[in-house]
Amino acid sequence: MTEITVEKLATEVGKTVDRLIEQFAQAGIKKAKADTVSESEKQQLLDFLKKQHGADAQPTKMTLQRKTVSTLSVSSGGGQSKDVKVEVRKKRTFVKRDGNEAALKAEEEARAQAEAQAKAEAEAKAKAEAEAKAKADAEAKAKAKAEAEAKAKASASAAKEQPKPVESEEAKAEAARLKSQQEEAAKSKAAQEEAAAKEKARLLAEENAARWAEEERRRIEAERYGDHHVTTSKVARAAEDSADLDDEKRGRRNRNKTQTKSKRGGKDAREGREKHMKYKSTPESMAHGFNKPVAAVTRDVRIGETVTVAELAQKMAVKATEIIKAMMKMGSMVTINQVLDQETAQLVAEEMGHKVVLLRENELEHQVLADRDDEGTTKLEPRAPVVTIMGHVDHGKTSLLDYIRRTKVAAGEAGGITQHIGAYHVETDNGMITFLDTPGHAAFTAMRARGAKATDIVILVVAADDGVMPQTIEAIQHAKAGNVPLIVAVNKMDKPEADIDRVKNELSQHGVMSEDWGGENMFCYVSAKTGQGVDELLEAILLQAEVLELKAVRDGMAAGVVIESQLDKGRGPVATVLVQEGTLRQGDIVLCGLEYGKIRAMKDENGRPIMEAGPSIPVEILGLSGVPSAGDEATVVRDERKAREVALYRQGKFRDVKLARQQKSKLENMFANMTEGEVQELNIVLKADVQGSLEAITDSLRKLSTDEVKVNIIASGVGALTETDATLAAASNAIMVGFNVRADAQARKTIESEAVDLRYYSVIYDLIDEVKSAMSGMLSPEFKQQIIGLAEVRDVFKSPKLGAIAGCMVIEGIVKRSAPIRVLRENVVIYEGELESLRRFKDDVNEVRNGMECGIGVKNYNDVRVGDQIEVFETIEVARTL
């Protein structure tokens, strides 16, 4: 097969190039990215990986069991014999030596043999060289000496002959000396070579030890951090072998007993064996390669508008109990399914050391509201001012507006007071003005606040004969909070008791100064009855509007605010919308708070149908999916399907947030709720004609609650009283209250059959007063003790039947037989009980009047003395009021 590069091989095996190069290096092969890989190198790498991962691990031990059964005939008494089975068992264990261990041992033996052979060869070689060198030196010396002697002998005249044996002995001695020197040199050289060989062997052993230690360390790291399945398989095999050995030993010990029992017991023994096998010990749990993190893990927790405790725990990767414990430390008791608001969840997550990312889940809402027709946004045109008339009740707000509109609105109001926000537009000679008429009663605070929010100018109506009142002050506060200019209309100037200076003085105490006194507020003096000063008031309004330079976009999609809403029986949900920009047309798709819909019809304040309405025009629209809340923003959008999605999303979010707040309120009021059983509850099902009145009545009724009687509005809504409302009232023992609405036919049947208390009202004063009287009837009555008579003991007689009888003179009031009494001695009560007998001249009587004598027997009391006083009293019930 052709050789391939490292990069291509990494692609084939599915690993990174760096990882493959690292594995080659661990196997002892140095490779670069562009180098080629041969088949032998592949095989070498494969062998290394198998060895590292333990894939080539095979059983190193094998146990063979042999069983031989023979029959032995044994004689018994009576000349008979019986056969006895003899079973011989043999067990042999064969151990397979590890190939690596054998190779290492052979390598060590070969190394030792090589070192010994090298040492012997070195010694023999050194010895032979020394002997040869000594022999050569001896021969050379002997030859030189012989030549010198021959020359000397030839040149000398007379030479003395010397014996040869001496010369040969000297040569031999010299040769022996040289030989010994050579041998010493050879031995020293051999010793040096031996020391070098030992040093080399020591270094090799150290190198091998270091290499084996490194391999052991890598194996341990691989088991700890490496592939979980590889390390687990090794441990599993080892554990399985150990368990098999234990089971086999245990089986050998118990086999004889089990076999005996099985012969005797049959089925029971079989069941015992099965039970034993069922509950036999299992190998210990295998270790895993996961290590518990020692450092705290910080996560980015994404939190929406609402989140449950379980969801928050999942996002933070902790148990829900940890969050519950953390919130208990923070002072809140929660459950696992409880909904938390965004702020609470953020506090908990940050307390537990995580980073919080707040999500904007209303992305669809922003997208829908951004996809609007912006045509002509730069083309601003003047618009009519929106004027809100505020003031105290009965100061003539509606009458003044009635004179301006030349109609009779005030006469048609129930009780002569305004209970709705009336929206009207008036054409004057100088331009159009839109008026919002707000209620003056204290219960309509929210309606006045909405009026100030949607307005450009506030007209504060103050009666010249009444001055500044609580709702006047509240209207001033609303105007200041909304940063709206204020024009003061001093009404009822036709009355003789009108006092302008008093009104100015009282208003100045609340920061409203007239221009005459150096202030910024215009004062107009008007009379709704005669029409005095009305034209000046309109001019002041238009002048203030010119100063404000009120402009709005006339073209494009409309946007406005819901002034009032109601549920009409024939028309369905009806909303009064004040257009603030754009043009509202019939057929537009409107997104209005939690509701949406296509405008089916539009009407002006007089009930006439219209097709479109521009800025600052109040209009009634029909076709919404439900009754919107007053104060909601009404916006025209393109797509009805997306408008429905946004409305449903808002409803879900509103429901979740409301639930979270209710739960929080319940937990915070836990101790207060413990005494709820002692508090009387007045349940009310309330229906009103418009949203504003419903809010006002609900708020006023809840303020009536006391420590002893609580007003509980179990259901409220806009529209007629239905059968569902009647059924709910009957089930909860509630009274039904209708404000300017009536019950339908089905509801009346249910009310009659269930005997539900139904009450209709058209004036809010009457409703509040009657609910207050109903609450008074639910108060527990007070009991008062009233003294009705006093008798003085003049003498004491003994009676065999009644014991001590007191002869008394009635000195005050009446003494009655049925009334309880007290016995007083020196004006201290010593006994309280009841009369047993009351007689006059031996006759039993029911009562004895002042100035008469009588005999009194006190029940269960005989210690009556002369001079004691007997006080007669009765307990009367006193009704309480709020």
UniProtKB/Swiss-Prot annotation:
Cellular compartment(s): Cytoplasm
Region (G1): 391-398
An example Gene Ontology CC term for this record: cytosol
Region (G3): 437-440
Extent of Basic residues compositional bias: 251-264
Domain tr-type G: 382-551
Region entry Disordered, spans: 67-202, 223-278
Cited InterPro entries: DNA-bd_dom_put_sf, EF-G-like_DII, EFTu-like_2, IF2_assoc_dom_bac, IF2_II, IF2_N, P-loop_NTPase, Small_GTP-bd
Keywords: Cytoplasm, GTP-binding, Initiation factor, Nucleotide-binding, Protein biosynthesis
Binding positions (GTP): 391-398, 437-441, 491-494
Assigned protein family: Belongs to the TRAFAC class translation factor GTPase superfamily. Classic translation factor GTPase family. IF-2 subfamily.
Task of the protein: One of the essential components for the initiation of protein synthesis. Protects formylmethionyl-tRNA from spontaneous hydrolysis and promotes its binding to the 30S ribosomal subunits. Also involved in the hydrolysis of GTP during the formation of the 70S ribosomal complex.
Protein name (database record): Translation initiation factor IF-2
Organism name: Shewanella amazonensis (strain ATCC BAA-1098 / SB2B)
